[in-house]
Amino acid sequence: MLRFSANLSMLFGEYDFLARFEKAAQCGFRGVEFMFPYDYDIEELKHVLASNKLEHTLHNLPAGDWAAGERGIACIPGREEEFRDGVAAAIRYARALGNKKINCLVGKTPAGFSSEQIHATLVENLRYAANMLMKEDILLLIEPINHFDIPGFHLTGTRQALKLIDDVGCCNLKIQYDIYHMQRMEGELTNTMTQWADKIGHLQIADNPHRGEPGTGEINYDYLFKVIENSDYNGWVGCEYKPQTTTEAGLRWMDPYR
């Protein structure tokens, strides 16, 4: 049976962040993920998770100056100390909240450096993070993102991510495979998820175009959900989409799985 995790950074945006946990539970979710927990008190997050009987499934490493347009710093030479501080913060929250997956947004390709410098920096940072997370029995994830939504993002495809995993050489580094992003960049969703199932550590869903809930676009999620159910993937499926109206009104797609 598929297990869906509500991405509270995108769902239930009609409510204050801490109120979204209760709304997710009321709508039948048993897991939640969110991008950045760092502005919230750990004890407060533990309380809203426990009081709503929710499992925290995923959060991201700190990603630099988000308001200024940064989308990660792992590939930027000269930011290594900041990156390592972010790894420590992510682990501190994961220990307290109980999640076993942390996603790394690698960042936009920086100007002024050679491709070799950028790649070496990224590999070294990911290797450091993976080794630190391995001590905590936590998976490190890297997420390819389409370059239409985030122009200049450094990691945009599955094969690029697979090559990066090989170069880093840590068994707890896997792909966060976002079906929406990869539909925009590659297509071949079924074949990719089937062929590289052992390299996928987390799945996320949204339809295309407009990144709405399943059933609002071109992706055949009825079919893909069967593919996922029949695969070896047994993790959470993160619902990281933009509701086309309200979150509750757009959840009919989930009725067969509640």
Curated annotation (Swiss-Prot):
Its EC number is 5.3.1.22. Not stimulated by addition of pyridoxal 5'-phosphate (0.1 mM), FAD, NAD(+), NADP(+) or ATP (1 mM each). EDTA (10 mM) and metal ions (1 mM) such as Ca(2+), Co(2+), Mg(2+), Ni(2+), Zn(2+) do not affect the enzyme activity. The active site is at E143 (proton donor/acceptor), E240 (proton donor/acceptor). It comes from the Bacteria. Transmembrane segments: none annotated. InterPro entries: HPT_OtnI_isomerases (IPR053398), Hydroxypyruvate_isomerase (IPR017643), HyI-like (IPR026040), Sugar_Epim/Isomerase (IPR050417), Xyl_isomerase-like_sf (IPR036237), Xyl_isomerase-like_TIM-brl (IPR013022). It holds the Pfam family AP_endonuc_2. One of its GO terms (molecular function) is hydroxypyruvate isomerase activity. GO terms for biological process: glyoxylate metabolic process. Optimum pH is 6.8-7.2. The keyword Isomerase applies. Signal peptide: none annotated. Homodimer. Belongs to the hyi family. Catalyzes the reversible isomerization between hydroxypyruvate and 2-hydroxy-3-oxopropanoate (also termed tartronate semialdehyde). Does not catalyze the isomerization of D-fructose to D-glucose or that of D-xylulose to D-xylose. Also does not catalyze racemization of serine, alanine, glycerate or lactate. NCBIfam families: OH-pyruv-isom, OxoTetrIsom, PRK09997.1. This is Hydroxypyruvate isomerase. The lineage of its organism: Bacteria, Pseudomonadati, Pseudomonadota, Gammaproteobacteria, Enterobacterales. The gene is hyi.
